[in-house]
Structures are given as C-alpha cells and as structure tokens.
C-alpha cells in the first residue's frame, strides 16, 4: 500500500501478527489510542479493561464514568469516579466531566445517545479513552456505535456516513471477547488513514 505509517504503527501491526498482546496494548496506551471492548456479561472485558488501566501512566488524571462501580484505579491517585443513574444520564455526566480537566475519560459502556458526546470528547483533547459496547463481532462495532450516536440530538442532524466515518477514525482498537478469551482484535491504521482522506 502507499499509506505512510509511523514506526509505532508498524510495531503494533507486528505485535498483533505475533500475538504479542502486551507489547501491542502498551504501545496503544502510550500513544493514547481509543480502545473499545466488546463481549457479553462475564466475557472478561471488564477484567481486561482493568489491566489496561494499570498500563496508563500513574500520574494521569483519570475520570471514570460508570453506572455501577467496577473500575478501581488504585495506582492513579489523581482520579474522579462519576456515576450515572436514572435521573442523571451518562450524557450529563460527560458534560460535567469536561469541567474536571481529565487527561483520559473511561466510560464503562456505550448504551445510547451519549455515544456522540463521548466521541466528541475523545476528539477534542481527551484521547486515550477506554469503553465497551454490545455488538456481534469486532467488525460491526463501528456500525453499532454509529447507530447509538445517531440517537443524539446532534446525531439526528448529521449524515450517517459522516457519523460512521467519525467512529471509524476515533475508535482505533476493538477487542472482542467470548467466554473469557479475546477472539478478535481489530486495528487497521491503513483504513483510518484512507477514511481521514476520503478515500474509503
């Protein structure tokens, strides 16, 4: 291909090919890529997310957004845990979160119209996000998140292709879990490069 990739992207592709997941994810965390975990209840995605959180530099200001407390951050002293309930939505929490000057925002699950707000946060100075979504496989994740984003007031006024391309260029890595094993790993910097330039 004629796509110029950075050395670290080649290193990640090599690590992925060799199933060297520790190297792959350490680079992904260091480069502040946005990572999405996929899988059903009990699939292992929360346990894996905790392992990724431990890889984040400990002086990072973390904001976690959850409905029930799952993500402990014992090594990150500069953190805030925010919770959404029926009367306080994830969308409202994301808006409030911006005032807390986070380095990284960890949203445990994308479920509804907050998806667009979270994508916007990742694209406006807060990269390195970790989140999860329910989808059938790794390749369908971008489409699922785009569907959720279209439920927002902003999303309703935008073309679907624009939203989908925003998702494809924002979510860098997708990990699909099935019965506590990671069965799929998506990372395609070539596709991202082409989408950013309108060539896909």
Predicted regions and their residues:
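Residues in well-ordered beta-strands of folded domains
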Residues: 1, 83, 185-186
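Switch/coupling sub-region of P-loop NTPases
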Residues: 22, 32-41, 51-168
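Conserved lysine of the Walker
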Residues: 45
């Amino acid at each position: 291909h004629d796509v110029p990739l950075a050395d670290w992207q080649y290193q990640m592709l090599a690590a992925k090919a060799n199933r060297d997941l520790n190297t792959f994810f350490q680079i992904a965390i260091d480069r502040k890529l946005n990572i999405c975990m996929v899988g059903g209840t009990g699939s292992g995605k929360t346990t894996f997310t905790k392992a990724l959180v431990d890889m984040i530099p400990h002086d990072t200001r973390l904001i976690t957004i959850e409905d029930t407390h799952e993500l402990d951050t014992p090594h990150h002293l500069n953190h805030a845990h925010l919770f959404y309930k029926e009367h306080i939505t994830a969308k409202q929490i994301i808006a409030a979160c911006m005032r807390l000057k986070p380095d990284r925002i960890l949203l445990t699950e994308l479920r509804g119209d907050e998806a667009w707000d979270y994508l916007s946060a990742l694209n406006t100075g807060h990269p390195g996000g970790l989140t999860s979504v329910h989808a059938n496989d790794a390749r369908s994740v971008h489409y699922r998140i785009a569907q959720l984003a279209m439920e927002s007031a902003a999303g309703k006024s935008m073309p679907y292709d624009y939203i989908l391309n925003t998702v494809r260029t924002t979510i860098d890595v997708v990990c699909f879990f099935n019965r506590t094993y990671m069965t799929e790993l998506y990372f395609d910097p070539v596709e991202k490069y082409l989408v950013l330039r309108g060539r896909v």
